[in-house]
From Swiss-Prot:
Record protein name field: Beta-galactosidase
Gene: lacZ
Cofactor note: Binds 2 magnesium ions per monomer. Binds 1 sodium ion per monomer.
Catalytic activity, as annotated: Hydrolysis of terminal non-reducing beta-D-galactose residues in beta-D-galactosides
Site, Transition state stabilizer: residue positions: 373, 407
Binding site for substrate: 110, 209, 477, 553-556, 620, 1041
């Protein structure tokens, strides 16, 4: 039934009769009486309100508290509920997911369906929510016109009654369901009742990697339209080849009763007018009668018309400069009186694939994208405007220009905000059948064709007026079948202005204009059966392949991950047809739960008693659930930044800056530079940045490098900031940065022996603070007995155990400084990437954690092989050898040489040999538990945020200071975290460590991180745990289910050496 037809008289079926049909188990029944899809309507009754986007009096929200009753299956619902509320009904907010209000449980699964796989059947025990609400209408709404109800999102299927009469049925959780209520309304109070089913045959098409929840989770509203009204509006822009002029094409359809469609006296009495505004300036206007040119031998459309307005020198829309016009479409009667008006933001932009490149307005675009689920930790899938805007601002601030709506059409407001703030959008149909075997089983089944097709066609019909949408997607992980080919052709016919992408079937079928693989690697082929994933460099060079490649998913950001991300961006900038991709994904999909004491925590799969579940696999975000950043977000920001830097010379000091902006000039950018010596500023300056799009410019910063006043590393830091605030960023927002280590001019030390020694022995630079005339005092004392070796200097005493060979205690003024002795450390608390798909019921022998377990890395037995003491003239030296074995097989050999000097320093040289049979260890380092707890940590090295050997592009060498608690990254699933690399000096309380090392420091031991399932369960331990690594394996991140650490970041050598110098300032 079309929206042009009045609801006919129908025999009212009882609730049991309706339910007995089991429409929710018939894929060929997706709706009853649902109106056709169209762009959002407001039905303004004056042009100015439409042009200024004022709230429309013709809309009435039904959001708020509804009456709610919960049942375990639809057949349990009493028949009289359709007419009156049940006694046990409770209030429930709309929009909301009922699982977050004490009914039923949310379920998190990735691939596995949460119900037995028997399509189209679903379980008889099918949780059912019964909603109802009373409302009253303006008397004018009842006097004339049509009143419709709009549900923007209901999961997964629902029936609707109004005043006890059945209205209709709908499924597809992520697109609006709209019904004409006019025949059912009455004066005074009206009651609507909605029966929502958790599972339907549509659930087999909604197998996305997300929390499975139910209810009316998007807005509900009433809309009043005139009897004769605008039924559909399609807006397109066409730019001239030189982009100097454009045509605005508007196709508008009018609702006219079917019996009058062929009456020219009726149809010819209506006119359509389009006005195009730029702010308050009317740019163009056109008015013409209803009707089109003849379409075929039967004639024209009499209920629609096409209007084309020519615009000279249009301001173009892009994510960089999202200039929007406003098109007001008015329906006029024969007296030229306004019947109603609709209005839409219009962006003049062209999307095309030309010569193998995706181009926006003629420019090849580099997609700086991210996948985003609609998720909020408290409200689940019910998202408000504040949350939508928060995500957009964060994305823009961190150099994202694109977002993929994974994996369903989003809330209508999302697209309006992306239009206005500037983000390119891949709009994706609500289709995923990942749990089917094969995935294409349903897409090749004709009985499912209508269910598939409505999810694609209705998405396009709702969203096609948005300039932000540059690509349509047929869905996600649903294989490749005949249905996909048909829907690809439908889109290309109905919207030739946008390309279509679809990853299923290998990312390179005829149903996609873009090669859009997921998790293809930069240089490594993955020759999977049927659907091989070639390296992205290889893929674009395959014979007869000319399409651009944009990764629909890459860089799986699960927990402490994102290693090797910079490699992708090196490739993107090197190979033109590698045009970026969409990171997986934006936000950790954790929900707020409460423990037995009512305290909140972030939960993941299984925490609600949900089965089946995929545990913490829902947490792959660049941001935590509350949108605070993961360290990986900074890595993405830096890799994707729009300015690239190169150092041309040091005398004079000249750099080159290239703008990767395609359309905007750098009219709000200031270049700041600073020459740093060991973290201290030696010379600095700033100047405006004046760069045209896609241009480069040299900047002369200084005539020569500054004269050094002490030895150390010299660095040049540059950054670009925006002096003025923008719609998406505050003033002084940092948008780009870079750093180079400079050649060091010869430092001429004084004749003082201490300075000279420091110059030629950089590892002793921590001693430069000693006054020049300070005299060495007191000799070192050595004491030995059968159990201990003690080295004493002034108030300090180092005590070794002869049994273990370890430094068992460090005394200062008779106070013990160590709670656990200093010892080797070769393991880390496993990362999600280390674990991969390995779990208790499914062991993956290729996972790093399983290889380490099998080798005995977590159960190493240590033996002291030898212990030697030498009392030299100015120092004491203790040499110890340690052997590590598992099941009597030697695996590691560690040789430590401790040197104690008359400055109270302990220098340790460590040499580690690794058996060739042992898998590469996670780290080569040492750890101990310090008795002290200091409020701050101060270091000279890479920072300020967490960084790892394969994730340090965004980190900078400098002098940093942070509170102790900020040295721990609170990943929801605890793991190794908090490392800072390439450190030369660490100060913690009275402790000073120097050398060249990585370190991590926190209140939690590696052992506690290994055995604790959730962040909130971690208990601060006594003292402080200090991890010092000479070497640390990368974290990986190409994906999280197979080993993805690149070979350069794996500890594959047989021997490793490092040196650390410790001192306690008494």
């Amino acid at each position: 039934m079309t929206s042009q037809e009045k609801v006919p008289f129908q025999v009212q079926l009882s609730l049991p009769q309706i339910l007995s049909r089991r429409d929710w188990e018939n894929p060929q029944i997706t709706q009853y009486h649902r109106l056709e899809a169209h762009p959002p309507f407001h039905s303004w009754r004056d042009v100015e309100s439409a042009q200024k986007d004022r709230p429309s009096p013709q809309q009435q929200t039904l959001n708020g508290l509804w009456s709610f009753s919960y049942f375990t299956q639809p057949e349990a619902v009493p028949e009289h509920w359709v007419r009156c509320d049940l006694a046990e009904a409770k209030p429930l907010p709309v929009p909301a997911n009922w699982q977050l209000h004490g009914y039923d449980a949310p379920i998190y699964t990735n691939i596995q369906y949460p119900i037995p796989v028997n399509p189209p059947r679903v379980p008889d025990l099918n949780p059912t929510g019964c909603y109802s609400r009373d409302f009253t209408l303006e008397p004018s709404w009842l006097a004339s016109g049509k009143t419709r109800i709009i549900f923007d999102g209901v999961s997964s299927a629902f029936y609707l009654w109004c005043n006890g009469q059945w209205v209709g049925y709908s499924q597809d959780s992520r697109l609006p369901a709209e019904f004409d209520l006019t025949p059912y309304l009455q004066a005074g109070s009206n009651r609507i009742a909605v029966l929502v089913l958790r599972w339907s045959d549509g659930s087999y098409l909604e197998d996305q990697d997300m929390w499975r929840m139910s209810g009316i989770f998007r807005d509900v509203k009433l809309l009043h339209k005139p009897e004769i009204h605008l039924r559909d509006i399609h807006i397109m822009t066409h730019l001239s080849p030189e982009f100097t002029s454009a045509n605005l094409e508007v196709m508008a359809a009018v609702n006219i009763p079917s019996l009058q469609l062929n009456d020219p006296q009726v149809t010819g009495s209506y006119q359509l007018r389009v006005q195009l505004w730029l702010a308050d300036k009317l740019v163009a206007s056109l008015q013409q009668p209803l009707g089109t040119q003849a379409i075929d031998e039967r004639g024209p459309y009499t209920d629609r018309t096409q209007l084309v307005l020519r615009i000279d020198q249009p301001l173009l829309w892009s994510a960089e400069q999202p200039t929007l016009y406003r098109a007001v479409v008015s329906l006029l009667n024969h007296q030229q009186e306004l019947i109603e008006a609709e209005a839409y933001d219009v962006g003049f932009r062209q999307v095309a694939i030309h010569q193998g490149l995706l181009k926006i307005n003629g420019k090849a675009v580099l997609i700086r994208g991210v996948n985003r689920h609609e998720h909020h930790p408290q409200t689940g899938q019910a998202i408000d405007e504040e949350s939508l805007l928060q995500d957009i601002l964060l994305m823009k601030q961190h150099n994202f220009n694109a977002v993929r709506c994974s994996h369903y059409p989003n809330h209508p407001l999302w697209y309006r905000l992306c239009d206005r703030y500037g983000l390119y959008v891949v709009d994706e149909a609500n289709i995923e059948t990942h749990g089917m075997q094969p995935m294409s089983r349903l897409s090749d089944d004709p009985s499912w064709f209508s269910a598939f097709s409505e999810r694609v066609t209705r998405m396009v019909q709702r969203d096609r007026n948005h300039p932000c949408i540059i690509i349509w997607s047929l869905g996600n992980e649903s294989g490749h079948g005949a249905t996909h080919d048909a829907l690809y052709r439908w889109i290309k016919t109905n919207d030739p202005t946008r390309p279509v992408q679809y990853e299923g079937g290998g990312a390179n079928t005829l149903a996609t204009d873009i090669l859009c693989p997921m998790y293809a690697r930069v240089d490594e082929d993955q020759p999977f059966p049927a659907v091989p994933k070639w390296s992205i460099k290889k893929w674009v060079g395959l014979p007869n392949e000319s399409r651009p490649l944009i990764l629909c998913e890459y860089a799986h950001a699960m927990g402490n991950s994102f290693g090797g991300f910079a490699r992708y961006w090196q490739a993107f900038r090197q190979y033109p047809r590698l045009q970026g991709g969409f990171i997986w994904d934006w936000v950790d999909q954790s929900l707020t739960h409460h423990n037995d004491h009512g305290q909140p925590y972030w939960a993941y799969g299984g925490d609600f008693g949900d089965t089946p579940n995929d545990r913490q696999f829902c947490m792959n975000g660049l941001v935590f659930p509350d949108r605070s950043p993961h360290p990986s977000l900074y890595e993405a920001q830096c890799a994707q930044q729009f300015f690239q830097f190169s150092l041309l010379s040091t005398t004079p000091l000249v750099i080159n800056i290239t703008s990767e902006y395609l359309f905007r000039e750098s009219d709000n950018e200031q270049l700041y530079w600073r020459i740093m010596l060991e973290g201290e500023s030696m010379l600095e300056g700033s100047q405006p940045l004046n760069l045209s799009p896609e241009s480069s410019q040299c900047y002369r910063l200084a005539e020569k490098l500054p004269t050094l006043n002490k030895p150390g590393q010299l660095w040049l830091n540059v950054e670009i900031r925006q002096p003025k605030e923008t719609p998406w960023s505050p003033a002084q927002h940092r948008s780009a940065w870079h750093q180079w280590r400079l050649p060091q001019p010869l430092f001429s030390p004084s004749s003082d022996l201490t300075n000279a020694t420091a110059h030629y022995a950089p590892q002793l630079q921590h001693n430069l603070q000693l006054q020049h005339n300070r005299q060495l005092q007191h000799d070192l004392q050595l004491q030995q007995d059968e159990q201990h070796i003690k080295v004493t200097y002034q108030q300090q005493c180092w005590q070794f155990s002869r049994q273990t060979g370890r430094l068992a205690q460090w005394w200062v003024a008779d106070k013990p400084m160590l709670l656990r002795p200093l010892q080797d450390q070769f393991v880390r608390a496993p990362l999600d990437n280390d674990i991969g798909i390995s779990e208790a019921t499914h062991i993956d022998p290729n996972a790093w954690v399983e290889r380490w377990k099998k080798a005995g890395m977590y159960q190493l037995q240590q033996r002291c092989l030898s212990l030697h003491v030498d009392h030299l003239s100015h120092s004491v030296q203790i040499s110890a050898e340690y052997g590590y074995e598992f099941e009597q097989e030697p695996l590691l050999h560690s040789h430590w040489v401790y040197r104690f000097d008359r400055h109270g320093r302990m220098t340790i040289d460590v040499n580690v040999r690794i058996a060739t049979s042992l898998p590469a260890p996670a780290r080569i380092g040492m750890c101990c538990q310090l008795a002290d707890i200091s409020p701050t940590v101060d270091w000279l090295g890479l920072g300020p945020h967490e960084n790892y050997p394969d994730r340090q592009l965004a980190a900078q060498y400098g002098h940093w200071s942070l509170p102790l608690e900020q040295m721990h990254t609170a990943y929801i699933f605890p793991s190794e975290n908090g490392l800072r690399c390439n450190t030369h000096t660490l100060n913690y309380g009275r402790w000073t460590l120097t050398g060249d090392f990585h370190f991590g420091i926190s209140r939690y031991s590696t052992q506690q991180l290994m055995v604790t399932s959730h962040q909130h369960l971690l208990e601060p331990e006594e003292g402080t745990w200090l991890n010092i690594d000479g070497f640390h394996m990368g974290v990986g991140g190409d994906d999280s289910w197979s080993p993805s650490v690149h070979i350069d970041d794996i500890l594959t050598r047989e021997t490793y050496q490092y040196q650390i110098c410790w001192q306690y300032k008494v």
